[in-house]
Amino acid sequence: MKRALSSWGLMAALVFGVNAAGAQTTVFSTDFNGPLPAAIDPGSALLTGVQYFAGLGPTGQAFGGNFLRSATGNVVTLTLSGLPDHSAINLGFLFAAIDSLDGTGTYPAGDFFHITLDGRTIFRESFANATPDQIQSYVAPAGVTLARRVDLGFGGPGSYYTDSAYNLAADPAFQNIAHTGSTATFTFQIEGQGIQSLDDESWAMDNLSVSVNAVPEPQTYALLLAGGAALGWAAQRRARA
């Protein structure tokens, strides 16, 4: 009996293992170190050297070379088509908060990083760099903050011109977002009454990627379950022998 249970346990592990191994399929990625992909409409955003952001981030996925830098108020759009069957979508990128972003303030009246998927808001939080007493609504989960209110180039140095960096790929808010369509449109914008010119405040992204949680083919489960039945039958025969 124990052998039979062990066999079924093995098959269960195989089922979940296959599901996990095939769970995420990358459908888009760019490090912005070549021509801008056709899937991205940058608006007024430009490929720009990362300056002192270089090296911040996980091994193999750190800031480096160029990133896509945008003025506040500008909309960057990523449009994907021909997506495979899936049950959820995942978004990952490094986010650079550059210079005097004002958080949730009264004057200026706030800088909110707003991300939508197919017109639906999936993220809207304020970011503050200018002074320590400003309110930043975004509370980064463990492992997301790479730098906070330090001079990483651009408008700095100066008390109002510090920078911050975040690995938003590590934030669970961007994982397992319900989605099943064959197309997906993401928009990225810092908006709010406090938006100002590029030489005062801006933002950038690097190592942008999108993956989907693929729906396993029905025959995969059928084959695994058939194999499990065979293993269980063989184990029972051995137990009786």
Specify the residue positions occupied by each region the protein language model found:
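Extracellular carbohydrate-recognition regions
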Residues: 24-48, 122-127
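Extended, low-complexity, turn-rich repeat/linker tracts enriched in Gly/Pro/Ser/Thr and Asp/Glu
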Residues: 97-108, 194-197
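Short coil-to-beta strand junction motifs in C2/discoidin
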Residues: 104-113, 202-203
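A short, hydrophobic C-terminal helix/tail in secreted or cell-surface proteins
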Residues: 217-236
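Extended extracellular/luminal ectodomain segments enriched in beta-structured repeat modules
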Residues: 83-92, 181-183
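Surface-exposed, low-complexity/disordered Ser/Thr/Gly/Pro/Asn-rich loops and linkers
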Residues: 48-79, 199-200
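Terminal, low-complexity interaction segments
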Residues: 30-36, 138-213
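Short beta-strands within extracellular/lumenal beta-sheet-rich domains
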Residues: 70-86, 111, 168-174
